[in-house]
Amino acid sequence: MSPPTQSLQVKLLDPRFGDLWPLPAYATESSAGMDLRAALEAPMTLQPGDAALIPSGIAIHLADPQLCAVILPRSGLGHRHGIVLGNGTGLIDADYQGPLLISTWNRGREAFTIEPGDRIAQLVILPIVRMGLQVVDTFVDSARGAGGFGHTGVR
């Protein structure tokens, strides 16, 4: 696998990293995200409908205001077990330096146990474009216009 093109400052908040658990890393050459682990002291069971903030065991500092990080669910956990993020997506601003917490929600029908070290989410770094607002009275017409939910149909 080719080496990363940029570096990310990471604080290890859990001593099990490097010993019991590897650092977050890209699993394949084309992976967009690095898996985040549940830095729990003991197994945690989420009953259907329960939500919990789970520590990732790391803190990051992007420093570059043209970047952000997002915490996203792992597709298999959501599809097979109903384990998703309680906040949909976790947005991490470039100047945030605190611990990464994973809002985890069991939207499934069965209890699900998360073990210490389980990979429960993924971290993706994205570019940011900051826009200035231009107040207008009307927009130039577009093909879609103001068509909202369901506007383009399903077929």
From Swiss-Prot:
Domain of life: Bacteria
E.C. numbers: 3.6.1.23
Binding site for substrate: R74, S75, G76, N87, L91, I92, D93
Gene Ontology biological process terms in this record: dUMP biosynthetic process; dUTP catabolic process
Cofactor: Mg(2+)
Listed Pfam families: dUTPase
Presence of keyword Hydrolase: yes
Pathway info: Pyrimidine metabolism; dUMP biosynthesis; dUMP from dCTP (dUTP route): step 2/2
Protein name per its UniProtKB record: Deoxyuridine 5'-triphosphate nucleotidohydrolase
Organism of provenance: Xanthomonas euvesicatoria pv. vesicatoria (strain 85-10)
